[in-house]
């Protein structure tokens, strides 16, 4: 696991974290690798537990005097790493992402931070008691019975400790006693919401949004949307949160998925129509500090249709955060990209693309392009026992298969590596070459990259600075609203820098020169309106 000692992107060993004037986790990542016998050149089925702190923070800042925005989902579990406070723990770990990394000089890397996620009282699919005990801890309900009887459908943070009590990686240097209900407000909060407050105090123009739901917590949406009492409770819960945290000005509803199957959530053909009623009720509430409502939408055209997006826009939705990732997940034995811009329609291996989804929204649903935001990913999708039938090295369209969907290499969950893992163990962007036997391959048809090792037979589909810059250029060429990252706690800056540079923004404060990371000598890649290179006719690239 050799690394360039003078790298501008990564430390040569885990620097640890200073807590209560002590650093008891310096070198913890390396101790974890040793404990688990993790070796990137041969490991195909292990979790690495690689923390974000191994990556150096290199966010540049850029002029943002155009009509595009770059947004950031930031997760409420990203601050944790038990190795920081217990030096006996080395066989597991956490992301250890410091929210104050985003407090950059001379501007901000993101227009808006999106707190992810608020849960729902009464969601017994997520929590056996429907988050009732959490509602009591936060002072929203007097007891569990009251929570379910009178507050079902309201949104609350589902981890009070991480949301308003934690200190580590949230901008606070020591533990202070306090109950969650006492700190569940902007003035007194610690935790991630307290960290958001610190960022707000440093930059009054930085926007904040609350995202409700997500993959794991969408189980109650269908019931809420169809029930007048629960809709009212839902709106009252939003009011309560925005009163407690007036720095928030935007709302994001991440229902996965209205009218379609998500994580086994209840759904109905009436979800789309009911969703529009729910949005209208939020709009009619006229919450004083609520300036915009976005939805997180699947990039699958069938799910877009079921969500009733034109009616949602009419009811008050101002932005669509198109989840243009996870196109590849394990299941059918065929390799494909997980966040590609284009797709060859004749390719039976790939099902989705950014361009397919954007075109469907604009041409079929008549959505204003400025309301559409596309996502870039700080994580990968992987497969093992993979065989690539495209020749390597090559810039041809990806074709390949895999035969094992079990326990594939990942950082904190199987088959998913996070950005710090990539730059530490699998790709050296400063040298422009793979690490530990992996090779980076560019698919010119899809405008996407992947890593592959002949030794481990592991396939890694990922975003790179090159692919994210292409996404920025796509946004600019199509006149979309902008881009967002899932998730900002995974990126050390070079993916987000690439998004800004794809939008052709002028740099204000340079922390790092991005030029080498694009892995080409052509500073101006071909535009999509007038390609300067041969394109696959089947891809409908115009």
From Swiss-Prot:
EC number of this enzyme: 3.2.1.14
Entry-linked InterPro entries: Chitinase_II/V-like_cat, Chitinase_insertion_sf, Glyco_hydro18_cat, Glycoside_hydrolase_SF, Glycosyl_Hydrlase_18
Mutant lacking the gene: phenotype: Cells with a disrupted yenA1-yenA2-chi2-yenB-yenC1-yenC2 locus are no longer pathogenic in C.zealandica larvae; chi1 was not tested.
Alphabetical list of SUPFAM superfamilies matching this protein: (Trans)glycosidases (SSF51445), Chitinase insertion domain (SSF54556)
Reactions this protein catalyses: Random endo-hydrolysis of N-acetyl-beta-D-glucosaminide (1->4)-beta-linkages in chitin and chitodextrins
Activity regulation field: Toxin complex is secreted when grown at 25 degrees Celsius or less; at higher temperatures the proteins are present intracellularly but not secreted.
Protein location: Secreted
GO molecular function: chitin binding; endochitinase activity
Binding site for chitin: 186-187, 213-216, 257, 323-326, 486
Residues annotated as domain GH18: 68-506
Class of the enzyme per the UniProt entry, highest EC level: hydrolase
CC per GO annotation: extracellular region
Lineage top rank: taxon: Bacteria
Keyword Secreted in annotation: yes
pH-activity profile: Optimum pH is 6.0, in the intact toxin complex optimum pH is pH 4.0 to pH 8.0.
One example of a Gene Ontology biological process annotation: chitin catabolic process
Main location: secreted
Alphabetical keyword list: Carbohydrate metabolism, Chitin degradation, Glycosidase, Hydrolase, Polysaccharide degradation, Secreted, Virulence
Signal peptide: none
Catalytic residues (UniProt): 256 (proton donor)
Subunit structure: Semipurified toxin complex consists of at least YenA1-YenA2-YenB-YenC1-YenC2-Chi1-Chi2. The Yen-TC:K9 subcomplex is about 26 nm tall and 22 nm in diameter with 5-fold symmetry and 5 copies of YenA1, YenA2, Chi1 and Chi2; the chitinase subunits may be solvent accessible on the exterior the complex. The Yen-TC:K9 subcomplex has no insecticidal activity. The native complex with additional YenB, YenC1 and YenC2 subunits is 16 nm taller and is insecticidal; the toxicity-conferring subunits are present at about 1 copy each.
PANTHER family noted in UniProt: CHITINASE (PTHR11177), CHITINASE 12-RELATED (PTHR11177:SF317)
Family recorded in the similarity comment: Belongs to the glycosyl hydrolase 18 family.
Role summary: Part of an orally active toxin complex (TC) with strong insecticidal effects on larvae of the Coleoptera Costelytra zealandica, Acrossidius tasmania and Adoryphorus couloni and some Lepidoptera larvae. The TC has an endochitinase activity. This subunit might aid infection by degradation of the larval peritrophic membrane.
Official protein name in the record: Chitinase 1
The organism of origin for this protein: Yersinia entomophaga
């Amino acid at each position: 696991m050799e690394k360039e000692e003078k790298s501008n992107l990564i430390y040569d060993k885990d620097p640890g974290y200073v807590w209560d004037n002590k650093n008891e986790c310096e070198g913890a990542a390396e101790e974890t690798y040793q404990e688990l016998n993790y070796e990137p050149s041969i490991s195909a089925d292990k979790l690495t537990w690689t923390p974000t702190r191994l990556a150096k923070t290199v966010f540049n800042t850029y002029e943002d005097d155009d009509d595009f925005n770059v947004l950031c989902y930031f997760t409420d579990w990203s601050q944790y790493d038990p190795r920081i406070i217990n030096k006996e723990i080395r066989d597991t770990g956490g992301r250890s992402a410091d929210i104050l990394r985003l407090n950059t000089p001379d501007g901000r890397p993101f227009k808006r931070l999106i707190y992810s996620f608020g849960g729902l009282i009464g969601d017994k699919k997520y929590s056996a008691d429907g988050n009732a005990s959490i509602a009591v801890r936060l002072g929203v309900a007097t007891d569990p019975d009251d929570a379910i009887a009178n507050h079902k459908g309201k949104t609350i943070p589902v981890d009070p400790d991480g949301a308003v009590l934690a200190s580590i990686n949230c901008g606070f240097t020591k533990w202070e006693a306090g109950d969650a209900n006492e700190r569940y407000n902007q003035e007194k909060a610690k935790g991630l919401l307290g960290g958001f407050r610190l960022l707000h105090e440093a930059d009054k123009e930085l926007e904040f949004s609350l995202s409700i739901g997500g993959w794991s917590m969408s189980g109650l949406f269908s019931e809420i949307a169809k029930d007048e009492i629960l809709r009212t409770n839902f709106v009252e819960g939003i009011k309560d949160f925005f009163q407690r945290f007036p720095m928030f000005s935007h709302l994001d509803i991440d229902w996965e998925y209205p009218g379609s199957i998500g994580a086994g959530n209840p759904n109905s053909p009436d979800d789309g129509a009911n969703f529009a009623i729910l949005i209208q009720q939020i709009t009619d509430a006229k919450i004083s500090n609520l300036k915009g409502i976005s939805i997180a939408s699947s990039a699958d055209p069938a799910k877009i249709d079921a969500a009733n997006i034109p009616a949602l826009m009419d009811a008050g939705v101002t932005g669509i955060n198109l989840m243009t990732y996870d196109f590849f997940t394990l299941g059918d034995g065929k390799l494909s990209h997980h966040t590609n811009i284009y797709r060859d329609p004749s390719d039976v291996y790939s099902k989705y693309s950014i361009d397919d989804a954007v075109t469907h929204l604009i041409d079929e649903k008549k959505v204003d392009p400025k309301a559409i935001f596309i996502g870039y990913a700080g994580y990968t999708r992987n497969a093992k026992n993979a065989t690539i039938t495209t020749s390597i090295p090559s810039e041809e369209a990806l074709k390949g298969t895999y035969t094992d969907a079990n326990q594939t290499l990942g950082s904190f969950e199987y088959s998913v590596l996070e950005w710090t893992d990539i730059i530490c163990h699998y790709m050296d962007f400063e040298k422009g070459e793979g690490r530990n036997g992996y090779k980076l391959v560019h698919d010119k048809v899809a405008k996407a990259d992947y890593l592959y090792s002949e030794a481990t037979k592991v396939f890694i589909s990922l975003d790179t600075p090159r692919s994210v810059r292409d996404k920025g250029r796509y946004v600019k060429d199509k006149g979309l609203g902008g881009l967002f990252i899932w998730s900002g706690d995974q990126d050390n800056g070079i993916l987000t820098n690439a998004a800004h540079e794809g939008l052709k923004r002028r740099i204000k404060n340079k922390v790092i020169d991005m030029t080498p990371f694009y892995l080409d000598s052509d500073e101006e890649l071909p535009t999509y309106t007038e390609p300067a290179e041969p394109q696959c006719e089947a891809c409908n690239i115009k």
